[in-house]
């Protein structure tokens, strides 16, 4: 699945304005760079698993509030869901690097003055020395578990 935010969309719009036929962008929550093709004849950007029209791309470029996902032959969809079981609303919020989850209006990471990765590093640093077995209790997007697992004296990370 391709995930886009205003950040990637603006990069692609800029590439289109420069009349380039190929771009390299981060489409998997900031993990790896991917080459995409720009088709001026059909006015769309072609990803390995989907396409998006220039019109929809511009709409996403102007929406800094939420991430979108793309599926074959469908319009971009906002990454959001309401759980009737918990009565909570979840959505994926973009930031300068990795996104964060917002649960009923509360962001799980700071995103104004810090990025989610920086926020996670701050939290882990406040717990030093970190060693042995670690319990991660939130398990939103895994930033804390990933960061804790990289600490040299941590032997295991449990999440739930």
Residue ranges and their predicted role:
Residues 1-95:
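N-terminal auxiliary segments of SAM/dcSAM-dependent transferases
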Residues 98-106:
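Short, basic/glycine-rich phosphate-binding loops at helix/coil junctions
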Residues 136-138:
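Class I SAM-dependent methyltransferase core
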Residues 140-154:
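Conserved SAM-binding loop of SAM-dependent methyltransferases across substrates and taxa
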